[in-house]
Amino acid sequence: MTASQRTLMVMAGGTGGHVFPGLAVAHRMEAAGWRVVWLGNPAGMEATLVPKHGIPMEYVRFGGLRGKGLKTKLTLPFNLLRACGQSLAALRRVRPDVVLGMGGYITFPAGVMTALSGRPLVLHEQNSIAGLTNKVLAKFAKRVLVAFPGALPHAEWTGNPIRAELAGTEAPKARYAARSGPLNVLVVGGSLGAAALNEVVPRALAMLTPGERPRIVHQAGAKHIEALKANYEAAGFAAGEDVRLVPFIDDMAAAYAAADLVICRSGAMTVSEIAAVGVAALFVPFPYAVDDHQTSNAAFLADAGAAVLVQQRDLSAELLADWLRGQSRASLADMAERSRSLAKPEATDEVARVCAKAAGANLETLQ
């Protein structure tokens, strides 16, 4: 670190939905010459993932209360006090010019201590329904940013920071016009899989005639791939050129861009990535998400005719088969264009600019 180099502290952890957008901003700031330090939980995924990106870590131990037992709730005051002390110590060691909160349990004690220490705090809410931590911290933050309009009062709509390759894909109109033959459908269950999709999609395909069936790429998560293969075999399909079953996908930008339709859950980053690429989507929100935020995330696109939203309780093989019969590449291309029009491809740069400005930096350092 040089005497003139400014420092950004990113506080985020727990899930990829918090960590990956934080990493996108961190790398953008590093490219502009900033020093970046990450504040996370030693038990979270960030403790393993972030150091692989060459970013130094500071740690705070703090967990959530939802669904926890009486013992956890009784020890909350002690754990919160300890986390506040750890947060203050980290802030004193790092001495950041600005702190960016991207979500996760540790954001609460660290955000409180950031505000009390007089350092500028920038918050970013990834979901369409803000969590309790950000609702509280928004009262003390210098700038409040949201991925979906209306998630927090008096906030700036920047979108979700995403990987550059997702924002740089060819326009939907050109991609769809270049294709012929069966529709290309990508089914994404995520790293944990989505049992409802894994069961319903094969049965829906079996209800279609050979001429109606799309080509399928179905990602199920490593723990669910064998069960997925069994589901397709039970429906009369063997993995081959028209049915590809995979545990994970390395290049999601290419997978999204090659699809005419994506069938998936509606986590914040998934919705943002689909809009950035511009691809039609059928969202099946995870029914047990906190505050049912996945339904609200999906509705952002669905209400604009840019996607279709089906609740898991309503999803059936019959419904999916009937809906697929009614789709054409042209209708899906129209949906994809609407989706792309709602994207915020400059989100990473915009969040970085806000952080720089909050620290009193010249925005020309983020060219």
Swiss-Prot record:
It comes from the Bacteria. GO terms for biological process: carbohydrate metabolic process; cell division; cell wall organization; lipid glycosylation; peptidoglycan biosynthetic process; regulation of cell shape. The keyword Ion transport does not apply. Its EC number is 2.4.1.227. Pfam families: Glyco_tran_28_C, Glyco_transf_28. UDP-N-acetyl-alpha-D-glucosamine binds at residues 15-17, 127, 163, 191, 249, 294. GO terms for cellular component: plasma membrane. Cell wall formation. Catalyzes the transfer of a GlcNAc subunit on undecaprenyl-pyrophosphoryl-MurNAc-pentapeptide (lipid intermediate I) to form undecaprenyl-pyrophosphoryl-MurNAc-(pentapeptide)GlcNAc (lipid intermediate II). Belongs to the glycosyltransferase 28 family. MurG subfamily. This is UDP-N-acetylglucosamine--N-acetylmuramyl-(pentapeptide) pyrophosphoryl-undecaprenol N-acetylglucosamine transferase. It comes from Burkholderia lata (strain ATCC 17760 / DSM 23089 / LMG 22485 / NCIMB 9086 / R18194 / 383). The gene is murG.
